[in-house]
């Protein structure tokens, strides 16, 4: 990407709130029901019906606001956002415009290292502009009707919290890191189930470019309804390339709304981008202003869980893990709880190795089986014993992986499964110096060429000899002990 251009990204994220009923009616919000079976007269905009605000939706918005350190508006207004679309029965959407319920706030993100670009991992704080309550629209179904479009109003009126950032992100990597952090937070708080496939969490990305050093923002394009982190990254990267190439070829970027085509991995124009005045916002006369007293905020505060940021800091200070690792370990409540349970059994001295295992072998196995950490077949106590056996020298790290896989595959229920498997398969590390010296002597005799190369100054030859020694012991030798004995014998 051309280094003379700076990327500017702001995200608008729609988080579907986990209420049982809709934001202005008593209709259910269950996903996957038959079309138009979860829409009541309010959702259908039939004459003579009035909206009634769902208290649970408001409390979830307050909970989010408290978590990000925002200001909870003591008085906020619902407004009508006027536009025509077939799946919007009223001809307007009830949203918030001038006075949102959540104002300001910030989220600290951990941006992973980019080894190809030579960029290390770093931390960044993203400021939020606002978060406001609104209702979702229905859904247009194009595939099932030849030449026609079906309208499913089950989703109409589902409560959403639209979360808007300042245009402070400068790369797709930062945008994805923010989206992942936000996703983890709303799920952690219990205000959204975070199911991206069902549309419970989706992002709109506002993307522009400008010459490095220029203060004025470039013309932005909005990419709508990105419902996976991969699509978000691909869409932003494509859009940045498109805009830079367009400008460098003498063209101008048009303010518009675009869609991302994941098959072609490109964005395409959908419609011209509207401004606020196009929607003719005005206060909804059917809804009173939302008044939130301090006592209400305090009641919500009393029910708040320990937040990921606080736990991350505790993990760094108490266990000595890196800030990035702490961020991964708090990606979900279940992951954080599992890590703490492992450390409680294995001891704080083994916290770093526990963190490495959770981010490595454990995550790899979870991905392989397509399950979440709360469904892991290896208990925290079982993994802790594996780590203890590495620490006390009973087994090597390589053998530990074999034991972990065995416990996983057999879905063992006994807490001492690691010891049982070690004994049954004879996997104890060979730490007897005499026995190891005999094996190393055989390895040196059989690999005279490598010995000569090492003595000639080739360090790789030494690694080859270690590999041969480990192979001769079937991975059961203590690697450190092998290293020391080889150095001793090779002088």
UniProtKB/Swiss-Prot annotation:
GO terms for molecular function: asparaginyl-tRNA synthase (glutamine-hydrolyzing) activity; ATP binding; glutaminyl-tRNA synthase (glutamine-hydrolyzing) activity. It catalyses: L-glutamyl-tRNA(Gln) + L-glutamine + ATP + H2O = L-glutaminyl-tRNA(Gln) + L-glutamate + ADP + phosphate + H(+); L-aspartyl-tRNA(Asn) + L-glutamine + ATP + H2O = L-asparaginyl-tRNA(Asn) + L-glutamate + ADP + phosphate + 2 H(+). Its EC number is 6.3.5.-. Keywords: ATP-binding, Ligase, Nucleotide-binding, Protein biosynthesis. Gene3D superfamilies: 1.10.10.410, GatB domain, N-terminal subdomain. Signal peptide: none annotated. Pfam families: GatB_N, GatB_Yqey. Disulfide bonds: none annotated. GO terms for biological process: glutaminyl-tRNAGln biosynthesis via transamidation; translation. Belongs to the GatB/GatE family. GatB subfamily. Heterotrimer of A, B and C subunits. Allows the formation of correctly charged Asn-tRNA(Asn) or Gln-tRNA(Gln) through the transamidation of misacylated Asp-tRNA(Asn) or Glu-tRNA(Gln) in organisms which lack either or both of asparaginyl-tRNA or glutaminyl-tRNA synthetases. The reaction takes place in the presence of glutamine and ATP through an activated phospho-Asp-tRNA(Asn) or phospho-Glu-tRNA(Gln). This is Aspartyl/glutamyl-tRNA(Asn/Gln) amidotransferase subunit B. It comes from Burkholderia ambifaria (strain ATCC BAA-244 / DSM 16087 / CCUG 44356 / LMG 19182 / AMMD) (Burkholderia cepacia (strain AMMD)). The lineage of its organism: Bacteria, Pseudomonadati, Pseudomonadota, Betaproteobacteria, Burkholderiales.
């Amino acid at each position: 990407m051309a280094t003379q251009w700076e990327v500017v990204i702001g995200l608008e994220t729609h988080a579907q709130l986990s209420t049982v009923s809709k934001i202005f009616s008593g209709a259910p919000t269950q996903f996957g029901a038959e079309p138009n079976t979860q829409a009541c007269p309010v959702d259908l905009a039939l004459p003579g019906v009035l909206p009634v605000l769902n208290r649970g939706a408001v409390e979830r918005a307050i909970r989010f606001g408290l978590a990000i350190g925002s200001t909870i508006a003591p008085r906020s207004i619902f407004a009508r956002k006027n536009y025509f679309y077939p799946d919007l029965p009223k001809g307007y959407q009830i949203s918030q415009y001038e006075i949102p319920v959540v104002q300001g706030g910030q989220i600290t993100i951990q941006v992973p290292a980019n080894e190809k670009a030579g960029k290390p991992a770093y931390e960044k704080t993203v400021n939020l502009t606002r978060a406001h309550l609104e209702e979702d629209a229905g859904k247009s179904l194009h595939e099932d009707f030849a030449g026609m479009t079906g309208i499913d109003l089950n989703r109409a009126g589902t409560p959403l919290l639209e979360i808007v950032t300042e245009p402070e992100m400068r790369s797709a990597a930062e945008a994805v890191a923010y989206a992942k952090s936000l996703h983890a937070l709303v799920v952690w708080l219990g205000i959204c189930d975070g199911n991206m496939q069902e549309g419970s969490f989706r992002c709109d990305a506002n993307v522009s470019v400008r010459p490095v050093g220029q203060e004025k923002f470039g013309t932005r394009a909005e990419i709508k309804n990105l419902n996976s982190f991969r699509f978000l990254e691909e869409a932003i990267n494509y859009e940045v390339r498109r805009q830079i190439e367009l400008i460098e070829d003498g063209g101008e970027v048009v303010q518009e709304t675009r869609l991302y085509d994941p098959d072609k991995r490109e964005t395409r124009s959908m419609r011209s981008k509207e401004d606020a005045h196009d929607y003719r916002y005005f206060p909804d006369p059917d809804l009173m202003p939302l008044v939130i007293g301090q006592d209400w905020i305090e009641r919500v505060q009393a029910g708040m869980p320990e937040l990921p940021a606080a736990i991350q800091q505790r993990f760094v200070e108490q266990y000595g893990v890196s800030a990035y690792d702490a961020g991964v370990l708090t990606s979900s409540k279940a992951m954080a709880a599992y890590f703490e349970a492992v450390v409680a059994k294995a001891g704080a001295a083994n916290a770093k190795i526990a963190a490495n295992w959770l981010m490595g072998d454990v995550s790899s196995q979870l991905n392989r089986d397509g399950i979440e950490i709360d469904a892991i077949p290896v208990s925290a106590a079982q993994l802790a014993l594996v780590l203890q056996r590495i620490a006390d020298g009973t087994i090597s790290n390589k053998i530990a992986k074999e034991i972990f896989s065995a416990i996983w595959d057999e879905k063992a229920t006994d807490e001492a499964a690691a010891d049982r498997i070690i004994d049954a398969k004879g996997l104890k590390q060979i730490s007897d110096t005499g026995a190891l010296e005999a094996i190393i002597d055989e390895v040196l005799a059989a690999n005279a060429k490598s010995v000569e190369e090492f003595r000639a100054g080739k360090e790789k030859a030494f690694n080859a000899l270690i590999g041969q020694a480990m192979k001769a012991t079937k991975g059961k030798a203590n690697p450190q002990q092998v290293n020391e004995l080889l150095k001793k014998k090779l002088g």
